[in-house]
A protein has these predicted regions:
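Active-site microenvironment of metallo-dependent hydrolases
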Residues: 1-31, 36-49, 90-91, 97, ...
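Divalent metal-coordination and catalytic microenvironments
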Residues: 14, 28, 33, 59, ...
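Metal-associated gating/positioning segment near the N- to mid-region
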Residues: 52, 57-120
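Short active-site segment of divalent metal-dependent hydrolases/proteases
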Residues: 68, 73-75, 185, 265, ...
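Active-site core of metal-dependent hydrolases
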Residues: 133-134, 138-266, 282-284, 418-419
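Structural motif of enzymes handling amino- and sulfur-group chemistry
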Residues: 271-278, 294
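Short, charged, surface-exposed loops that flank catalytic or proteolytic processing sites
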Residues: 283-291
């Protein structure tokens, strides 16, 4: 997604997040898809012009859009599959193809472009504005109207065992950009040895971004720190597959540690669910959790337009939730998809709750379509009615699940309840 040139806008009334523990009541001026000024509410009236479109977010906390470091967008509609525990990811992959071939085939029958859109919508609903997609950068992901930003400059390989020629993949990675690979995803010797296999191939350097790292030990952490490699963890996925949580007191020894939500094939839910899971079961502090979905993944993914923050000259990528008076980091402890009531990406409104529709100018909400998910209605800048109709032609009426949550078009939901 690219920022879109448009008239000047002003977000007013919200408590604006400047950092994990820092906020100010401010007027946020946006033009050309970027934040041009952040004015204190105390003296901001002098900078307010009558021709600016105003969005009233009084009573809300304005946060930076979240950065999801790791997802497989094409699997958003898949159910959680497996009969754990497993020893490693290869064992899991072999098992689900033997146990659930019909389920896998049915979901793969949904055209990939449709599934990618649902992956974007799943992230949008959770307040994610930028996502790292671990698979090819298919053309659909590069459309200007795709629901969220997808990182475009990166290299990737699946894993040491399943990634093919990793040397070639690394050589094809743009200079200075991340090379992302699953590693040490399991609890056995095969998983533990992968880090050293990557080292022997000469792939461990400051561009290396490992995903999972469950089997990494202290010696491995020392190697990663020496090579300045980064790590992305997906705790709920590890817990489901292997019955083991990542030791974040150990893994936090790497230079940069971010959080990703992985795919619904193995994960607990969306990125907000993953944040709460990590805080509850892995002992991640509110401050660390905030950094793991904002500044740190932005750094790991080499983002350069203030993604993960609210800053003058940066992209106007912001989300809004009801303000409970706590710090931004503390707010994450209870945040779920149902709390995200407003999302703007590049100055363009992408999501609005029903309660906020009347506060946002019509010019900003025109073209949004309603989606009912788990009893919550959100208006989205996506052709959700057509997407759902085409998806249900294959999966069956009422059978579509987005991140294991049921999705409906609100009118269809009303008809269903009336029967």
């Amino acid at each position: 997604m690219n920022e879109q040139p448009q008239n000047s806008q002003m977000i007013r009334g919200a408590r604006c997040v400047l950092g994990p523990q820092e906020t100010t009541h401010a007027l946020v001026h946006i033009a050309g898809g970027r934040i041009t000024r952040i004015l204190s509410s105390l003296d901001g009236s002098s900078g307010l012009q009558s021709d600016w479109e105003q969005i009233d977010l009084n009573g809300f906390l304005l946060l930076p859009g979240l950065v999801n470091a790791h997802d497989h967008l094409e699997f958003a509609l898949f159910p959680r599959l497996g009969s754990p525990p497993y020893r490693n990811y290869i064992e899991w992959g072999d098992d689900i193809h033997n146990r659930f071939p019909e389920t896998i085939a049915k979901h793969r029958a949904v055209p990939r472009d449709l599934r990618l859109w649902w992956g974007g919508i799943r992230n949008l609903l959770a307040g994610v504005t930028t996502v790292g997609h671990h698979n090819p950068l298919w053309p659909e992901l590069q459309r200007d109207d795709f629901p969220v930003r997808v990182v475009r400059e990166y290299g990737w390989g699946h894993s040491l065992a399943l990634g093919g020629d990793l040397h070639q993949a690394r050589a094809a990675t743009p200079d200075g950009r991340p090379f992302i690979v699953h590693a040490c995803e399991g609890v056995d010797e095969l998983a533990r040895a992968e880090l050293w296999g990557l080292e022997q191939l000469g792939l461990m350097d400051q561009s290396a971004v490992l995903v999972h790292g469950l089997a990494i030990d202290r010696e491995g952490i020392a190697l990663m720190r020496d090579r300045r490699a980064s790590l992305i963890v997906c705790p709920s996925s590890n817990n489901f597959l292997f019955g083991r949580l990542p030791d974040l007191s150990l893994l936090s020894g790497v230079e940069q540690l971010a959080l990703g939500n992985d795919s619904p094939l193995t994960a607990e839910g969306d990125l907000l669910d993953e944040i709460r899971f990590a805080m509850r079961y892995c002992g991640v502090s509110a401050l660390s959790a905030y950094q793991m979905v904002t500044a740190v993944p932005a750094s790991i993914l080499r983002l350069s337009d203030a993604e993960g923050s609210i800053r003058e000259s940066g992209f106007a990528d912001v989300i809004a939730v009801r303000d409970n008076g706590g710090s931004p980091a503390e707010r994450l402890q209870s945040m779920s998809m149902a709390d995200v009531e407003f999302v703007m990406i590049g100055g363009r409104v992408q999501l609005v709750s029903e309660a906020l529709m009347e506060r946002v100018p019509f010019s900003q909400t025109q073209g949004l379509e309603p989606l009912l998910i788990d009893g919550t209605t959100r208006w989205l800048r996506a052709p959700v009615s057509a997407l759902l109709e085409k998806t249900e032609e294959i999966l069956g009426k009422g059978k579509a699940r987005l991140g294991n949550r049921r999705v409906l078009i609100p009118a269809a939901a009303e008809t269903e309840h009336a029967v």
